[in-house]
Amino acid sequence: MLRPLAVLFGFISITPVFALTPVNTSNQVIISVRDQKLMLVQNGGKVATYPVSTSMFGVGDYWGRMTTPLGYLAVEKKIGGNAPTGAVFHKRRFTGEVLQPNAPGRDPVITRIIWLRGLEAQNAHAFQRGIYIHGTPQEKSIGRPASYGCIRMKSTDVAALYDRVPVGALVQITPEHLPKVAKAPRSQPASTFVTASAKPQTQDPAISASASDDTLSVEQMRKGGALAAQRAKAKL
């Protein structure tokens, strides 16, 4: 069952199995196994949604079963930032080979690697199992379970996600549908975004009026300066 967004955004009920990279809760990736989609959420607003492919063997965190783990994870490492689209990786190293989408007979990890680590007991082996978000040349399989445990994406999509998601970003893999999240305002600065679990902070006029006497507001200083100028002009 998908846990409330307030828990996701607040990150208040998660006890990490081990802490290597600090978790960044202003950046979240939500992956729905049911929808076969990935949603990028930044500062409480939906930035993008991409089709994905999770494991053809189901869900879980079992050694040797090639399943996709569920629960809360985090981006531990990013590999391939300067590699060309379609770059083939073997043991997380660029081989020099580049594949086009739907290249016949090949199914390697390509383009980008976003390596995940588990934050809960139910996904504690994710990092050691090599669970990635990565590109695949088999783009025709995107949108249905077809991977061997990882989360596959189209090359152009995983490259875009790679550039938007920092190390430490929170990742949730859920068996439920993606939650409804409002789109992030495009024209609003990121620093002023309001998360789903927070409200805009406004200052009560009464609090402003009760400020200490030795502290002047900008408006008070402006009025004081204008009054002083008027008095000086009257003396001339």
Regions found by a protein language model. Name each.
Residues 4-16:
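Bacterial N-terminal signal peptides
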Residues 20-24, 62-66, 83-222, 227-236:
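Exported/periplasmic cell-wall-interacting domains
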Residues 20-59:
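A structural motif detector for short, solvent-exposed N-terminal "entry" segments of globular domains
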Residues 33, 42, 54, 76-77, ...:
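Pocket-edge structural micro-motifs
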Residues 35-37, 72, 113:
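Structural motif
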Residues 47, 51-79, 83:
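Electropositive
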